[in-house]
Amino acid sequence: ACPNEYFYFDYAQDQNSVKKILAYDPCSDDRLSPEQKKYIWGVQANLWSEWIPTMKRIEYLIVPRMIALSEIAWVEPAVKPSLEEFYRQLVPQFKRMDVMRVNYRVPDLQGFYKVNAFIDETTIDLTCPLPGTEIRYTTDGSMPTKESTLYNGALDVTETTDFAFRTFRPDGSPSDVAHTKYVKAPYAEAVTAPAALQPGLKAVWHDFRGNLCADIDAAPVKGEYVVESVSIPEEVKGNIGLVMTGYLEVPADGIYTFALLSDDGSTLTLDGELLGDNDGAHSSVEIIVQKALK
């Protein structure tokens, strides 16, 4: 058995998958005594192949996660590389894997979120940890191909636009498609908070067995709580559908960034607008979104 969030390599990957592996310390579990920790011999990962059709797909799922696993097995926690340093060290190994035709997963593009907010205009400045790759993109909802527009430097955006970016290796092999939205909008107006407002969030627990957040409200209510953060109250067990509501204090006008991480579905609604859609049945996935607030 392995911690599934880190080491079930058949789980879908995102921008945090390798980072979480590198940050893992098998000796950091407070449930183990110093005497018990002496018996930790190493680390392992699992890959269940019932739904994996080809060896090429297996390669895609385990590389470079398998290399990150090896890194934490033989390197002391104090000297483990950062994600950026890890990919820098891998550059010559990626070239070797190109020659060997290994179907590795290209590192994620950097420089944008799932939803990006701007007021007048903004610039997309992409980077890829893997040198020698091409980045191509579309704005019409189609999947980028080798014939799509080439990203060749900073890209100015002046209107709300949906982008699909895709990286291509030197041999033409494509990466996953990265979808992002750039939203042009003025600062959202502040609202007047109730006079008797108390700190925290109101959390309503529903006895919910479904997969979509939109269906939670129709399920029976089992309890109401006040929580200090977005988290599951200790009393909540079994079938869980949580609806949390509250107010956000905005100290100054600006572009605010929100991260939404969940194992299965979650959504973030702000001022009645669905801002972050991380819904549906899935393993641990994080999305990051922005909104202009005053």
Residue ranges and their predicted role:
Residues 81, 87-204, 209-246, 255, ...:
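Short, compositionally stereotyped local motifs that mark structural "simplifiers"
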Residues 294:
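Short beta-strand-plus-loop segments that form exposed binding edges in beta-rich domains
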